[in-house]
A protein has these predicted regions:
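A short, compositionally biased
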Residues: 1-3, 32-33
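A preference for well-ordered globular domain cores
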Residues: 2-27, 41-171
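A short, surface-exposed interaction/processing loop segment used at functional sites
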Residues: 26-36
């Protein structure tokens, strides 16, 4: 195996580096006009420094996105839909608890689906309670992973810490 660097023949800017079979060195620069290739030794390559804070933040975002994907298995995604769910739950709990208050969301849905507001309220409360349990499981996994990433001291530990077994959250 040979180590090589491909560079712009006009500017000297390094374009890429790598390893190849002994007979393939000349082929490494044939991809574009103006590229040149040079065989180098391992000592010539320095590993680029990695910004661990940027890696950590990228992993946080990846964890959050994955958690949102899992949530979407149980509820309709979207912040406006989430607000409607909360409003319907508030109305449903008021109906179940015998409170007298307007129920525009439940009334509209009951009329559209042909069920009573009372039956719909019971169903909404049951679904909200089931969702709360799932949401708590998802949130615990999400926060645990982010806490592990925060404590990790190198990129390998960060990568391992960010792994979440979302399959724990049953359907």
């Amino acid at each position: 195996m040979k180590r090589f660097v491909v560079y712009d023949a006009a500017t000297g800017r390094v374009l890429r580096s790598g390893t190849c079979q002994d007979d393939d060195l000349d082929m490494q620069a044939s991809r574009a006009a103006g590229e040149a290739v040079m065989e180098i030794t391992a000592e010539c390559i320095r590993v680029a420094e990695v910004d661990l804070d940027a890696v950590r933040n990228a992993l946080y975002a990846k964890i959050d996105s994955a958690a949102e994907d899992v949530r979407a298995r149980f509820v309709t995604a979207g912040s406006a839909q989430a607000m409607i769910y909360l409003k319907k739950e508030d109305e449903a709990r008021a109906v179940v608890w015998g409170q007298s208050k307007p129920t525009p969301f439940l009334s509209a849905e009951a009329a559209a689906t042909g069920v009573t507001v009372a039956n719909l309220a019971a169903l909404v409360v049951a679904k909200a309670d089931a969702w709360a349990a799932k949401a708590a499981e998802i949130e615990a996994l999400r926060r645990r992973a982010k806490a592990r990433v925060a404590q990790a001291i190198n990129i390998a530990a960060m990568h391992a810490a960010a792994q979440v077994d979302w399959a724990e959250i049953g359907a």
